[in-house]
Amino acid sequence: MSLGLVGRKVGMTRIFTAEGDSIPVTVLDVSDNRVTQIKTVETDGYTAVQVAFGTRRASRVTKPLAGHLAKAGVQAGEILKEFQIDAAKAAELSNGTVVGPDLFEVGQKVDVQGVSIGKGYAGTIKRYNFASGRASHGNSRSHNVPGSIGMAQDPGRVFPGKRMTGHMGDDTVTVQNLEIARIDADRKLLLVKGAVPGAKGGKVFVTPAVKTRAVKGAK
C-alpha cells in the first residue's frame, strides 16, 4: 500500500546516457496532484488518500462533489483517485497537500496503469496472432477464418474463454516494473523507460512497483 500519482501521457521520446546509449522513454505529466480527502479506519473503515488531478470548470461539477471539494478547500479536477496507504503515511498528509514527482526517485521501479488504445472489432489474426490459412491449393474463401470453435454433440457448446473475433483494445492495462529514467522537477515530469498503455493525452496512474524482480547475483 503506497501513495501514487495521477498523470497524463505526453508522448514518447528518447534520452541518452553518458555512454551514448539511447533509451526510449515515455513522458508523463504528473503536475497538480492535490489531496482532497484523508480516509481513516475510524471514519471509513480503512486508510486511504484521495487525490485530484487536472482542472474542471465549476459548471461541470455536481453539487455533492462541489461540497466535498469545498470542504477540503481544493479546486475541482478531472479525476479523483484513491490510494490505500498506511496510517502513519496518511497522518503526514492533509487536505490541499500537493503531491509531486519527488514521491519517486531515478532508478525506482513503478507500475503504470492506463487504458489501452481501442482497435474496434478485430479478427482472430489481429487480436490473437492466429495464422492465416493457405493462400491456394484447395482453400476456398477460408483464408482468414478462425476454424472450428467447438466439438460434436458432446459437449455441444463453446467453452468459455474461447479465443474468437471481438472488440480489441480499450482495456485497463497495468505495465509492471518500469524504471524511472529521469525526473524533471521543474516541469513536474516523469520519464519512464519503455512504453505505457494508452494514447497521447490519456490518464495514467503511477505507483511504486508491487512485484520487484530479484537481481541475479545480488546478496
UniProtKB/Swiss-Prot annotation:
Renumbered to this chain, region (Disordered) spans: 134-153
On the tree of life, the source organism's domain of life is Bacteria
Short name of one Pfam family for this protein?
Ribosomal_L3
Q: Known Gene3D superfamilies for this protein?
A: 3.30.160.810, Translation factors
Keywords carried by this UniProt record: Methylation, Ribonucleoprotein, Ribosomal protein, RNA-binding, rRNA-binding
- Family, per the entry? Belongs to the universal ribosomal protein uL3 family.
Q: What is this protein called?
A: Large ribosomal subunit protein uL3
